[in-house]
């Protein structure tokens, strides 16, 4: 019987879609989920990859997906990859709390909901859960407070699941992903940032907008290369953390060996904080 894998967030041009193709090439039966099947791209034409609609912020949608997968596989799942997530770049003083909660629903609580729904299948298969987090969760970036804090929380959730699922025979691995060039961070696919007229940061809107769009960067890792590295690391049983993508290892080194204030200063040099009176930490 074929090994099985379910991957969330498999829209065309993203990490999930790239991983789906690699697992398929390695002989897995692949369940690739997307919010909207219209965005599935070339995955839709590959035999052996089943496209499923899934809204990871909906418990009911997750339940229906789990029931369908259980029927297809006889109640087992070898690998669950929680890859779906959303970005958010906005000053915290201007952030909509409703929108911020949606980011946490997608990047944090969806991991818990997926774990709850698919745990019986993973336990039965003595399988693996792979949770995709981000290097942003290890850094304090201006304008990324909502996103980076959600990634920090997601990493802690993943690590707690590792402890709690280990006695049940399920391996949990956290991927700390650095810069990867995907369709999702192509500037042409990202709307311009709009700050309220009352924002304290109006005069640096253009700078924050550049951070929002992340821009195409020559040093970002190709999505297909990153996907293959992550899949191979996971299948080779390489540790409880996987670091791939631009600056993922560098982040760990800087966090470990640089003074906190220096590290924070270095990564915020291009944030235009000095244009609004920023002079570093006050303590």
Curated annotation (Swiss-Prot):
Residues 1-20 form the signal peptide. GO terms for cellular component: endoplasmic reticulum; lipid droplet. Keywords: Glycoprotein, NADP, Oxidoreductase, Signal. InterPro entries: NAD(P)-bd_dom_sf, SDR_fam. Transmembrane segments: none annotated. The keyword Hydrolase does not apply. SUPFAM superfamilies: NAD(P)-binding Rossmann-fold domains. Glycans are attached at residue 131. It comes from the Eukaryota. Gene3D superfamilies: NAD(P)-binding Rossmann-like Domain (3.40.50.720). One of its GO terms (molecular function) is triacylglycerol lipase activity. Its EC number is 1.1.1.-. GO terms for biological process: phosphatidic acid biosynthetic process; triglyceride catabolic process. Pfam families: adh_short. The active site is at 133 (proton donor), 147 (proton acceptor). NADP(+) binds at residues 7, 33, 39, 55, 83, 147, 151, 180, 182. Belongs to the short-chain dehydrogenases/reductases (SDR) family. Short-chain dehydrogenase; part of the gene cluster that mediates the biosynthesis of the mycotoxin cyclochlorotine, a hepatotoxic and carcinogenic cyclic chlorinated pentapeptide. The function of cctT within the pathway, if any, remains undetermined. The NRPS cctN initially catalyzes the condensation of L-serine (Ser), Pro, L-2-aminobutyrate (2Abu), Ser, and beta-Phe in this order to produce isocyclotine. After the dichlorination of Pro2 catalyzed by cctP2 to produce isocyclochlorotine, the cctO-mediated transacylation of isocyclochlorotine can furnish cyclochlorotine. This is Short-chain dehydrogenase cctT. It comes from Talaromyces islandicus (Penicillium islandicum).
């Amino acid at each position: 019987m074929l090994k099985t894998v379910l991957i969330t967030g498999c829209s065309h041009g993203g990490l999930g879609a790239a991983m789906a193709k690699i697992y398929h090439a390695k002989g897995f039966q692949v369940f690739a989920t997307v919010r909207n099947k219209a965005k599935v791209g070339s995955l839709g034409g590959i035999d052996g990859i089943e496209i499923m609609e899934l809204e990871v912020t909906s418990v009911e949608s997750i339940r229906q997906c789990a029931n369908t997968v259980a029927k297809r596989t006889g109640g087992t799942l070898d690998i669950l990859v929680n890859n779906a997530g959303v970005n958010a770049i906005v000053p915290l003083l201007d952030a909509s709390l409703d929108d911020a909660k949606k980011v946490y629903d997608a990047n944090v609580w969806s991991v818990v909901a997926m774990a709850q729904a698919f745990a019986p299948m993973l336990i039965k298969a003595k399988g693996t859960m792979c949770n995709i987090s981000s290097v942003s969760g290890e850094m304090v970036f201006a304008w990324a407070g909502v996103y980076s804090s959600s990634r920090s929380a997601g990493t802690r959730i993943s690590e707690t699941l590792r402890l709690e699922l280990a006695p049940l025979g399920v391996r949990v691995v956290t991927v700390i992903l650095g810069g990867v060039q995907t369709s999702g961070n192509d500037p042409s696919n990202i709307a311009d940032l709009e700050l309220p007229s009352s924002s304290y940061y109006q005069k640096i809107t253009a700078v924050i907008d550049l951070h929002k769009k992340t821009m195409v960067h020559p040093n970002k890792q190709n999505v297909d290369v990153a996907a293959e590295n992550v899949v191979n690391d996971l299948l080779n049983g390489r540790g409880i953390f996987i670091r791939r993508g631009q600056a993922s290892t560098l982040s760990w080194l800087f966090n470990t060996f640089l003074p906190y204030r220096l590290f924070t200063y270095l990564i915020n040099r291009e944030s235009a904080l000095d244009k609004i009176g920023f002079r570093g930490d006050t303590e």
